[in-house]
From Swiss-Prot:
Ranges in coiled-coil conformation: none
HAMAP family: Ribosomal_bL12
Family to which the UniProt record says this protein belongs: Belongs to the bacterial ribosomal protein bL12 family.
Protein name, UniProt field: Large ribosomal subunit protein bL12
Origin species: Synechococcus sp. (strain CC9902)
Superkingdom per UniProt: Bacteria
Function: Forms part of the ribosomal stalk which helps the ribosome interact with GTP-bound translation factors. Is thus essential for accurate translation.
Lineage: Bacteria, Bacillati, Cyanobacteriota, Cyanophyceae, Synechococcales
């Protein structure tokens, strides 16, 4: 690799999970691409080769914090921290930046449990 790509790689390694998520969003916007779309194409290809078989049920879901009641900010922040394992600063930045991806690639049960936990304390969540 060139020195420039080595430098970029080292910078990427030092990013927090929240920073990496924000970087992905910025790349998607800047280049007009979607990281999720490529995964969907890969998953759809085996079903298409099956010749008329029913589409497989989606197994991974993204949990998105859409908004929250101002009076419930601290409770929502705690629920997000518990679910993601983020530090206080990263969780606060995530909650304040709503709408924001909270958890990516969660199982259906985990996504539903996280949605319930956040909505019980005053947040509005969607699952995609």
């Amino acid at each position: 690799m060139s020195a420039k790509t080595d430098e970029i790689l080292e910078s990427l390694k030092s990013l927090s999970l929240l920073e990496a998520s924000e970087l992905v969003k910025q790349i998607e916007e800047a280049f007009g691409v979607s990281a999720a779309a490529s995964a969907g194409v890969v998953m759809a290809a085996p079903g298409a080769a099956g010749g008329g078989e029913a589409a497989e049920e989606k197994t991974e879901f993204d949990v998105i914090l859409e908004s929250f009641e101002a009076s419930a900010k601290i409770k929502v922040l705690k629920a997000v921290r518990e679910a993601t394992g983020l530090g206080l600063g990263d969780a606060k930045a995530l909650v304040e930046a709503a709408p924001k991806l909270v958890k990516e690639g969660a199982s259906k049960d985990d996504a539903e449990a996280l949605k319930k936990a956040i909505e019980e304390v005053g947040g509005k969540v969607t699952i995609k």
